[in-house]
Design a protein with these regions (language model features):
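Mobile genetic element proteins and their domesticated derivatives, centered on retroelements
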Residues: 5, 22, 35, 46, ...
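Short, conserved micro-motifs composed of acidic
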Residues: 50, 119, 131-168
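Catalytic palm subdomain of template-directed nucleic-acid polymerases
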Residues: 6-25, 61-62, 99-126, 144-146, ...
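Conserved pre-catalytic core of RNA-dependent polymerases
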Residues: 1-63, 102-103
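Basic, alpha-helical interaction scaffolds
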Residues: 159-203
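Active-site palm subdomain of RNA-directed nucleic acid polymerases
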Residues: 70-105
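Hydrophobic alpha-helical membrane-association signature
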Residues: 72-76, 113-117, 188, 192-195
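Acidic/histidine metal-binding catalytic segments
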Residues: 30-35, 130-136
Length: 203
């Protein structure tokens, strides 16, 4: 599995493309207009050498802090998941965290498929004015086998060191290469003990 990171997900969302996507997906016109009102009206000032410009309208960006924002970005990036979908490869995403999962008996084959899928991601990013942050990528190989040869197989992506890790966090859940979830259970137990000790001190 290759875990990607979109740089400035909310800030780089094109208003024009988002509204077009809503129309293409068949949303009612009033939904499109409400969304237009939600994302429009953002302005900024440019500062250079102590000089401040007049207000400039911003044509990209979704307001942060609203429960509507992650939903709009998921709609904006939905085409990416459709592009990644194939017989042995699929994508999952929540806001700027996107994961590509591929399955085969060979780690080398998986790495090649992940590289191909990543190229599709880059093509989508160029089309939508989005940038990925390869220095924040993470790679992990999963297997249930006792003998785990080849789990150190790297992936070749510009800007990413390509080395697989032993575990990573997916939407708050720690997963390891053996899919034992021991680290997640350990972290949960540590948090529970910390809260219990704090409660006992109050009592």
């Amino acid at each position: 599995m290759l875990s990607l990171d979109i740089s400035g997900a909310y800030l780089n969302t094109s208003h024009k493309r988002l509204l077009c996507i809503l129309q293409q997906k068949g949303f009612l016109e009033w939904v499109v207009q409400v969304t237009r009102g939600f994302i429009k009206g953002q302005t900024t000032h440019l500062v250079a050498g102590g000089l401040v410009s007049q207000e400039v309208d911003i044509k990209t960006g979704i307001p942060q802090g609203s429960p509507l924002s992650p939903i709009l970005f998921l709609l904006f990036s939905s085409e990416l998941l459709e592009i990644l979908e194939s017989r042995n490869t699929r994508g999952s995403a929540f806001v700027d965290d996107t994961n590509i999962l591929t399955i085969s008996p060979s780690v080398a084959v998986n790495c090649r498929r992940l590289e191909e899928a990543h190229n599709k991601c880059l093509a989508w990013a160029r089309k939508h004015g989005v940038k990925f942050a390869p220095d924040k990528y993470q790679l992990i190989h999963f297997t249930r086998r006792r003998h785990k040869p080849g789990l150190d197989h790297p992936i070749h992506i510009q800007g990413f060191n390509g080395k697989p890790c032993d575990g990573l966090r997916v939407l708050g859940v720690w997963v390891d290469k053996g899919l034992t979830y021991r680290k997640h259970a350990q972290r949960a137990a540590e948090k529970a003990m910390l809260r219990l000790n704090c409660t006992l001190r109050i009592a």
